[in-house]
Amino acid sequence: MIKKMMFVMVSGLVLMFTSCGNQHKAQSLVKDFLDENLVDQDCSYERFSRLTPTAMISFGQMKAMRQNVSKLPYVKKNIDYNDAAYPDTLLYLRATYKLTNHQGEKQEVTQTFYLDKGLTRVIGFK
């Protein structure tokens, strides 16, 4: 437990010093992921939170998140998360965006996205 806490703290410091580049990369990754996996791709991004590390999400919790998300009407079914080994530490950020449906109705959505440490893939979101 102490090792995990130390790792998270050290990761936080490292991220603080490299956050600008990683923040932009994470936002781009989330945007690309949503562009590929939203049913209606008319999406405008409002804001993103800071990229933050966490070691508190187990693979079982992630599987449950994925199942819940697959029930949302604006998300495509059977998303390919390009599963590899589940990382010990994830990075997450919250994204707020607006969706516009075919009738022109807007819906604001805020979701948390979990990314791998290398910022190469979205592991899941809720």
Regions found by a protein language model. Give the residues of each.
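Sec-dependent bacterial lipoprotein signal peptides
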Residues: 1-20
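Cystatin/cathelin-like cysteine-protease inhibitor module
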Residues: 20-126
